[in-house]
């Protein structure tokens, strides 16, 4: 697979995260930022939510962004009609494809689903819209029926089929098998939409790409329904570094858009969140710090330069004397070996007591002053310095 197209759904599925509600300015700012980042497709909203949603979508469509814009619709006349007024060029027409949801959610059967796919995809195409046929709950559906749905949709003019792991129950090996199967049977674009209920959204997305997916759904920071979606930043960096697939995204712009979505959503990014967390390039353990100082690739899997970031070395419970000496040297203080060891003990006690990652410079200087006042315990005991 030489390339993969990102269809980011931060403005649709990301906003469906309980309690998240972007205002118009925030949605426009996020859309601009995603386009400037180089994201080729944006799913920007749900037209059937009402006039206010449609107005914002229309405003985004009027920005002249380089990204293709999509609207998410249920497979029904009302939603398709609403989408036509938003200015988007493509729609995702979504319907359940599992027998479970067809019966218990819609009280319908497979024959009805196939008829509606043919009818509404055809109407969307007549209206001048490109179509992605969204297969809700595809992960729990009969794959032969998913193929049938895809064939009917393609015959009616759809260019793409979206395989949605709606309740997040897929695992990478199963996802790989399903996309290999679909790519053999269907001659159309294939898109994966993964949820993170078992922490596998990004892994499932990568597996789908290995199986033949041409498009992937992502959200910034993994924001989304329940446990969230495949994170844009994770997918972009993993595809590039682990599989040699360049998505065309400006990775140095990722921290800024992560912060933008964090503010707009009110959802704080975890300190250890992969790629964008504040602590993902922070090192404390003495063995790791020593290795980094000798050669950064000793303990570097992801190069922070790709994100415009850098490694950070901090003092704490797991630090070594070498890091203590270097830190005090930066403060203009050269330590003897006994001082390094003594101060390391104080730093470890401080970190355990305060639960902080690193003492501040003033605190380090205070530790040193106290140590100097006490003197060398070995000399005080008559030992050798």
UniProtKB/Swiss-Prot annotation:
Single GO molecular function: homocitrate synthase activity
NCBIfam families: nifV_homocitr
Protein name as catalogued: Homocitrate synthase
Keyword list, A-Z: Nitrogen fixation, Transferase
Residue ranges of every copy of the Pyruvate carboxyltransferase domain listed in the record: 4-255
EC identifiers of the protein: 2.3.3.14
Species per Swiss-Prot/TrEMBL record: Azotobacter vinelandii
Family under the similarity heading: Belongs to the alpha-IPM synthase/homocitrate synthase family.
InterPro entries linked: AIPM/Hcit_synth_CS, Aldolase_TIM, LeuA/HCS_post-cat, NifV/FrbC, PYR_CT
């Amino acid at each position: 697979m030489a390339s993969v197209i990102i269809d980011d759904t931060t403005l649709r599925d990301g906003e469906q995260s309980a309690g998240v509600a972007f205002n118009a300015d925030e949605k426009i700012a996020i859309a601009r930022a995603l386009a400037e980042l180089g994201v080729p497709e944006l799913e920007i909203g749900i037209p059937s939510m009402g006039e206010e949603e449609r107005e914002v979508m229309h405003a985004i469509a009027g920005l002249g962004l380089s990204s293709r814009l999509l609207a998410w619709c249920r497979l029904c006349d009302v939603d398709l009609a609403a989408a036509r007024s938003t200015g988007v060029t493509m729609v995702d027409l979504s319907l359940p494809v599992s027998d479970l949801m067809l019966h218990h959610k819609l009280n319908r059967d497979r024959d009805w689903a196939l008829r509606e796919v043919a009818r509404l995809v055809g109407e969307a195409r007549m209206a001048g819209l490109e179509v992605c046929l969204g297969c809700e709950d595809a992960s729990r559906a009969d794959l032969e029926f998913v193929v049938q749905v895809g064939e009917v949709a393609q015959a009616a003019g759809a260019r793409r089929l979206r395989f949605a792991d709606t309740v997040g129950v897929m695992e990478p090996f199963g996802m790989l098998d399903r996309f290999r199967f679909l790519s053999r049977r269907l001659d159309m674009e294939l898109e994966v939409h993964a949820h993170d209920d078992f922490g596998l959204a990004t892994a499932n997305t990568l597996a789908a790409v290995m199986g033949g997916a041409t498009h992937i759904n992502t959200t910034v920071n993994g924001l989304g329904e329940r446990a969230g979606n495949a994170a844009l930043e994770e997918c972009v960096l993993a595809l590039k570094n682990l599989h040699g697939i360049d998505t065309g995204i400006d990775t140095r712009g990722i921290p800024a858009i992560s912060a933008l979505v964090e503010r707009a959503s009110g959802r704080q990014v975890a300190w250890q969140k992969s790629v964008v967390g504040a602590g993902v390039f922070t090192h404390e353990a003495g063995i790791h710090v020593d290795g980094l100082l000798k050669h950064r690739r000793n303990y570097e899997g992801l190069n922070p330069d790709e994100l415009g970031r850098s490694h950070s070395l901090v003092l704490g419970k797991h630090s070594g004397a070498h890091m203590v000496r270097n830190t005090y040297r930066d403060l203009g203080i050269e330590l003897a070996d006994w001082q390094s060891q003594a101060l390391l003990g104080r730093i470890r006690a401080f970190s355990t007591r305060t639960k902080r990652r690193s003492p501040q410079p003033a605190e380090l200087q205070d530790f040193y002053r106290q140590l100097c006042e006490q003197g060398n315990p070995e000399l005080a005991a008559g030992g050798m310095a």
